[in-house]
Amino acid sequence: MKKILLLTAAVLISGSAMAQHEHFHVFRNDKQFNTFNNVQEITYQRSPSSGYNKMQVTDAKGNTTTIDIEAIDSVVVRSTGIPEFHVNLTDHPDWTELTGSKSDEHPAILRMDGNGMYDDLPEQEVTFRGRGNSTWNMKKKPYRFKMDKKTEVCGMKKAKSFALIANYIDCSLMRNTVALWLANYLEMPFANHCVPVKVYFNGICKGQYMLTEKTGVGSGSVDIDEEKGMLFEIDSNYDEDYKFAYDLYSHTAVQNGYNNTRTLPVMISDPDLTEIAPALGLTADEYFDTWKNDFSAMLTAVMTTPSTGSLKEYIDIESVVNFFMVNSLSSNHEMRHPKSFKLYKDSLDGVYKFGPVWDFDLSLIHISEPT
């Protein structure tokens, strides 16, 4: 737990634009404490074989203090300078955390203090809910909020919905940030951005979160025509309304026949077919069948075609290279499940593009210790 506190403190400081004003307090279990101003760097060194377990704090003048981890009782960081989100439920002001289903929507009042880094968000009514799959069952809950109109938040493109990622099993709080930075560096279309923020829920500080776009078809994320294109997800959670399994051996689609030994779990992630299909003069099931057949044809080509030239008729090769480069360099274990494997297509006449990349909780030599 002590290591987690220290890593969290280090990330809070590194994520701040006002590091020269940091006040970092280390309270020792012998009732003494150390106070550091102008903290520039925190390093953590541990050797299980030798029992070495130390933290080093370096200030702006280059002075370094070494602290025994076992002597630390608690750590407090003041004035991190990162944006602060304040969310107060109007239907359950006494709750200390969201309960029930992640899809339960609650009316709330949200405001954001940009702390001089970004424009503030004035108080406004939002819809607040949970998100995530396995992460929803963890102690530090991930959230999602939706505003009445598209709004720019922390420099991100205007959108109605945004996600607050808890990063509970990432004791560095940096895995998703590093991977998404790499995706943007490679200029992958529609790659998510992220901003470290502090979240208060009904007045209770929930710690540091990662603000990012809600992945989906829309101007703030996968910006394609929702009446022509489609966003797919291959994910073993297999929990969307429109889904099918692709048999890797017979090269056929099997409705609701997902089996992790021989099939791929394919789902329509966005848009909502029940809303889009009627505008096209189709039922949702008819429109789903059209895209299911198209996606299956692409998978069959990938599984059976030896020629890269022929595959260009089905997939965008550059997007494939960048997708696997990000996941390989980050050593993302989610690919093995598979989970969060997203692909999109502008229209039925186009080609499939891999991305946007998502979910790097189990990456970069992961250590699943909570934050």
What are these regions (language model features)?
Residues 20-25:
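Cleaved targeting-peptide boundary
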Residues 15-19:
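Sec/Tat signal peptide C-region and signal peptidase I cleavage site
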Residues 77-368:
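Phosphate/dinucleotide-binding and metal-coordinating scaffold of catalytic cores
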Residues 4-13:
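Sec-dependent N-terminal signal peptides
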Residues 36-47, 68-77:
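Structured surface patches comprising rigid loops and adjacent beta-strands/short helices at the edges
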Residues 31-33, 64, 116, 205:
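Short, solvent-exposed loop/turn motifs
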